[in-house]
C-alpha cells in the first residue's frame, strides 16, 4: 500500500521509520519531509497546512493511508477534509483535536468529568486575570489557550512576573490568537511523565511512558523549547501510578470525549505530574510527542499500520500493543541560540556513521539538502535527535551521548544532563 506522512520533524522521521518496517507498505510519501526522511520516503514540497494540495496529491497518487504527525493540521481539521474526500487518514477530527487546541476546553472537560488536574480559572480579559492574580498564591502558572509550539506556558514566581506574563500572553499577543483566552493554574510539584496512547474512541491502549526535558539549558534552566531530549520508559511511572491512571485518567478521558459527542480516534499524549497527592493531568496533546515518538516508536513491535487502522476502524480491542523490554534515550542536537535566534544552512558531517545501525538512530528534525542535492544542511532550531536503545536507561544514555560525537555542524548545541533523573530512581 501507499502511505503519506504529513510533517517535517524528528517525530515524522520516527513515524516514517516505523512505517518503512511494515511489510504491507510499498511506497511512502512525506509532505514536506526533510533530508533524513528522504532516505526512506519521497518528500513532496507541500506544507502541512495546505490541506487542498495534500488531498489532491493523495488522490492523484492513489495514497491508501495518511498519517498526520503535527498538531497544527490536526487542530485545523485536516482529518475532516481528508475524510470528506473518502480518504483514509489517522488522527482525531477537528472537534476532538480541540483537546489540545484549547487548554481552556481541556480543563473544563477534566473538571466536568472529575479527571484529576490542577485547580484553575479561565480568562478572556486581561483585566479580570490581573484582578484574580492580586490574591493568588505564588508560584502560579499561566497558559496560552491555543497552540504555541509547546512554548505557551509561563511559570511565575512573583506577582510582578505574573503581571508581566498576562501582558505578554493577552496584551502583546506573543503567541498570537492562542493568547485570546488564558488559563491560570495552580503550580504543581512533582515529577513530570509523558504517556503516549492509541485509542479508537472506545478502547485505549498505552504505549509507554517517557520523560521530557523542556528547558534549553542544563539544570532545567533557560527558556522552554519543544523538547531537548527524552528517555523511555520513566522509572517513576510505577505499577501503582499506572493502575491509578488507568482507573481515573486514561479511559475517563476517552469516555468524556465520547460523551461530549467528540469521539477521539488517534493518539492521546498525556502530560502528567506525579504530585504528592497522586498523578494529575498537566496537558493533553493529540499526536505523538516530539521527541517522545523518537524514544517510544523504535521499541514498538507491532506493525504501526495495523495499529493505526484499528484506531480508525474501531477494532483496537482486538489487538495487543507490544514493546521491546528495552530503554531508549534521545539527545537533541540543536542550533546554538535556540529557541530564540540561531543560524541555519550550515553543513552537517558524520551522518553516515549511523548507517546500518539498529540500536542507534539519527532522527532528522531541522535539515534540508543544499543546492547540490547531496550535502545536508541545518534548517531549524532542533536539528537532529540522537537516539540509542539498550537493556537499561543508563546504558542507553551512555550510548546516545557517545553517538552525539559522530556528527558535527558549526553551531551544534545540546544539553549534557538528559536522563540525569535516571540516577535518582
Task: Map each language-model feature to its residues.
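Solvent-exposed alpha-helices and their adjacent loops that cap or buttress functional pockets
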Residues: 20-21, 36-38, 60, 90, ...
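Short acidic-hydrophobic, aromatic-tinged amphipathic segments that line or gate anion-handling sites
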Residues: 43-49, 121-125, 156
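Active-site "cap" helix and flanking loop/linker of ATP-utilizing ligase/carboxylase catalytic domains
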Residues: 246-268, 285-359
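Generic C-terminus detector
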Residues: 367, 371-373, 377-425
Amino acid at each position: 500500500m501507499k502511505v503519506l506522512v504529513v510533517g517535517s520533524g524528528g517525530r515524522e522521521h520516527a513515524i516514517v521509520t516505523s512505517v518503512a518496517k511494515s511489510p504491507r507498505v510499498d511506497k511512502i510519501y512525506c509532505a514536506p519531509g526533510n533530508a533524513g526522511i528522504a532516505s526512506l520516503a519521497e518528500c513532496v514540497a507541500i506544507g502541512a497546512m495546505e490541506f487542498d494540495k495534500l488531498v489532491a496529491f493523495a488522490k492523484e497518487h492513489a495514497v491508501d493511508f495518511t498519517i498526520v504527525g503535527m498538531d497544527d493540521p490536526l487542530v485545523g481539521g485536516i482529518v475532516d477534509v481528508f475524510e470528506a474526500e473518502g480518504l483514509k487518514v489517522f488522527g482525531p477530527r477537528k472537534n476532538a483535536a480541540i483537546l489540545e487546541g484549547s487548554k481552556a476546553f481541556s480543563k473544563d472537560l477534566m473538571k466536568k468529568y472529575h479527571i484529576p488536574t490542577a485547580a484553575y480559572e479561565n480568562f478572556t480579559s486581561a483585566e479580570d486575570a490581573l484582578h484574580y492574580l492580586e490574591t493568588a498564591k505564588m508560584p502560579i502558572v499561566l497558559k496560552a489557550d491555543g497552540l504555541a509550539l509547546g512554548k505557551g506556558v509561563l511559570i511565575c514566581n512573583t506577582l510582578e512576573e505574573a503581571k508581566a506574563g498576562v501582558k505578554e500572553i493577552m496584551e502583546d499577543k506573543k503567541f498570537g490568537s492562542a493568547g485570546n483566552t488564558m488559563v491560570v493554574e495552580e503550580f504543581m510539584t512533582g515529577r513530570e511523565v509523558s504517556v503516549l496512547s492509541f485509542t479508537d474512541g472506545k478502547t485505549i491502549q498505552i504505549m509507554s511512558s517517557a520523560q521530557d526535558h523542556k528547558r534549553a539549558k542544563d539544570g532545567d534552566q533557560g527558556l522552554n523549547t519543544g523538547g531537548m531530549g527524552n528517555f523511555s520508559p520513566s522509572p517513576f511511572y510505577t505499577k501503582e501510578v499506572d493502575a491509578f491512571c488507568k482507573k481515573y485518567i486514561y479511559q475517563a478521558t476517552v469516555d468524556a470525549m465520547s460523551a461530549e459527542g467528540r469521539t477521539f480516534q488517534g493518539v492521546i499524549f498525556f502530560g502528567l505530574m506525579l504530585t504528592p497527592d497522586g498523578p494529575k493531568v498537566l496537558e493533553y496533546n493529540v499526536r505523538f510527542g516530539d521527541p517522545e515518538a523518537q524514544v517510544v516508536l523504535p521499541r514498538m513491535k507491532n506493525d504501526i499500520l495495523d495499529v493505526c487502522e484499528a484506531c480508525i476502524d474501531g477494532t483496537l480491542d482486538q489487538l495487543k500493543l507490544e514493546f521491546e523490554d528495552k530503554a531508549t534515550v534521545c539527545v537533541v542536537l540543536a542550533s546554538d541560540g535556540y529557541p530564540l535566534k540561531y543560524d541555519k544552512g550550515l553543513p552537517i558531517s558524520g551522518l553516515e556513521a549511523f548507517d546500518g545501525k539498529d540500536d542507534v538512530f539519527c532522527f532528522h528534525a531541522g535539515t534540508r539538502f543544499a543546492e547540490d542535492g547531496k550535502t545536508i544542511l541545518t534548517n531549524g532550531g532542533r536539528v537532529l535527535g540522537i537516539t540509542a536503545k539498550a537493556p537499561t536507561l543508563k546504558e542507553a544514555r551512555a550510548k546516545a551521548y557517545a553517538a552525539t560525537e559522530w556528527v558535527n555542524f558549526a553551531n551544534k548545541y545540546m544539553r549534557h544532563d538528559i536522563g540525569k533523573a535516571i540516577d535518582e530512581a
